[in-house]
Design a protein with these regions (language model features):
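Ligand-binding "clamshell"
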Residues: 101-114, 128-129, 201, 206, ...
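A conserved helix-loop-strand patch within extracytoplasmic ligand-binding domains
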Residues: 114-163, 262
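Periplasmic-binding protein-like
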Residues: 149-158, 256-276
Length: 277
């Protein structure tokens, strides 16, 4: 009888202990659920340098309870579409002239430029010559096929003394706007990400810095001719219209204009990329 009473007391004690642990566990879960939850912001970016720059701001955003997820893209179309469709919260890969042209072609998109971050001077590259003055007659030249970067490439070729464009066309220039082509250059319009792959097939290629760097080219070393620091093509952070004042977006904007980001750009890219703030 005594044994039975002792056994029952121990069993009751064990049941109470397990019940208490279960309640404590449930209570902890409720506290976490009711506490301050981590906010997530997804930003689409080109791998180089945009995603690398975003990695720098992750720790600062984490201090504010914001988890930054970087979604890498290797084209110039999907990031804007994904932002508009709410698949991501923002994108960081393009300059203002490109955005304006893209929205003109896709008027259903409601996107806003909220911040300029850096400039990527476009350059002229070659695997066949070492100096821009060595460009031969009839040389094949690959340039970006999208309108704004194609026009930008033609302007750079004009600055390099290789051709002359119709007056006033600016960044909207096309191959048809070339009015003086003394070397009879032959143009190949290629999607911007593919331009580095054309270097073995053409004489010169005009390449955006991000794609050049992704192909292990060093602009300040390998470019035959580059845009200068006055380039108007500032790379920007883009969000959906109406999201400009979201706390997470504001925190991201502040972090991207920090001294940490400026120092990172200057130290890592050594003039190939220039802070715009």
């Amino acid at each position: 009888m005594i044994f039975k009473e002792v056994f029952m007391k121990k069993l009751l004690t064990l049941v109470l202990a397990l019940t208490t642990l279960a309640l404590v566990g449930c209570g902890g879960g409720a506290d976490n659920a009711g506490g301050k939850s981590e906010k997530v912001i997804k930003v689409g970016a080109s791998p180089v340098p945009h995603a690398e720059i975003l990695e720098v701001v992750k720790p600062e955003l984490a201090k504010e309870g914001i988890k930054l997820e970087i979604v890498e893209f290797n084209d110039y179309v999907q990031p804007n579409l994904a932002t508009n469709d709410k698949e991501i919260d923002a994108n960081f890969f393009q300059h203002e002239p490109y955005l304006k042209n893209f929205v003109t072609e896709h008027p259903e998109l409601k996107l806003a430029n909220v911040l300029g971050v850096h400039v990527e001077p476009m350059g002229i590259y070659s695997h066949k010559i070492k100096n821009i003055n060595e460009v031969k007659d009839g040389a094949q030249v690959s340039i970006p096929s999208d309108p704004t970067n194609g026009g930008r490439a033609l302007l750079l070729l004009e600055r390099a003394g290789l051709l002359k464009l119709k007056g006033g066309v600016g960044a909207a220039a096309t191959v048809q706007d070339v009015v003086d082509n003394p070397k009879k250059l032959q143009f190949k319009e290629i999607e911007a990400p593919q331009l580095p792959r054309t270097l073995d097939d053409v004489d010169i290629s005009v390449i955006n810095t991000n794609w050049a760097m992704q192909a292990d080219l060093v602009p300040t070393r390998d470019a035959l001719f580059m845009e200068d620091k006055t380039s108007p093509y500032v790379n920007i952070l883009v969000v959906r219209q109406g999201d400009e004042n979201r706390p997470e977006i504001q925190a991201l904007m502040k972090a991207l204009h920090s001294e940490a980001v400026k120092n990172f750009i200057n130290e890592k890219y050594k003039g190939a990329i220039i802070p715009a703030f």
